[in-house]
């Protein structure tokens, strides 16, 4: 990887942005959360269902974001099925800390790709959107499952 001196938008970011898995809404999800980045207006909606073991079993997204938000959504969606709500929350929290310069890259496939964005704090919100929405939706789905 080129580190923080690498281009912010590169071929891999653009490829991920163009190939978002699960990029359609679920018909009647257990939970749905929309997150918006106030600076750029990027929006990500995450719909999800949990199985009887409390793991993500179905996922749907609506992504209206910049290439960084789209690429982050792609990485989240490609690896969310089968995850527990705690894993999504841990990934969200680790991503937030890393972008703030307070930790190592998150243990989620591909997120190191955003290293060139570290000095660009105005871009961090759009990178976090999908992870924030997925973690919150998973928690809402769990609450609904328990109720």
Task: Label the predicted regions.
Residues 48, 78-80, 90-92:
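Short C-terminal domain-edge/linker segments immediately following a structured domain
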Residues 1-22, 83-147:
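C-terminal binding/interaction regions
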Residues 72-84:
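Alpha-helical support elements that line or immediately flank enzyme active sites
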Residues 64-70:
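Short, thiol/selenol-centered motifs that function as redox-active sites or metal-ligating centers
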Residues 16-63:
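Structured beta-strand/loop patches that form or line metal/cofactor-binding pockets in enzymes
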Residues 36, 78-81, 133:
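Short, low-complexity, polar/charged sequence segments that are solvent-exposed and flexible
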């Amino acid at each position: 990887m080129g580190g923080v001196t690498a281009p912010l938008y590169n071929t891999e970011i653009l490829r991920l942005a163009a190939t978002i898995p699960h990029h359609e809404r679920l018909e009647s999800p257990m939970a749905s959360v929309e997150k918006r980045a106030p600076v750029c207006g990027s929006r990500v909606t995450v719909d999800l269902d949990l199985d009887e073991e409390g793991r993500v079993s179905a996922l749907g997204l609506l992504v209206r974001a910049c290439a960084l938000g789209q690429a982050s959504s792609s990485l989240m969606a490609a690896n969310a099925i089968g995850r527990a709500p705690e894993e999504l929350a841990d990934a969200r929290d680790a991503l937030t800390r890393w972008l703030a310069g307070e930790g190592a890259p998150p243990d989620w496939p591909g997120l190191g790709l955003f290293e060139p964005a570290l000095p660009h704090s105005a871009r961090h919100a759009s990178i976090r959107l999908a992870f924030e929405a997925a973690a919150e939706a998973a928690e809402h789905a769990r609450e609904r499952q328990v109720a």
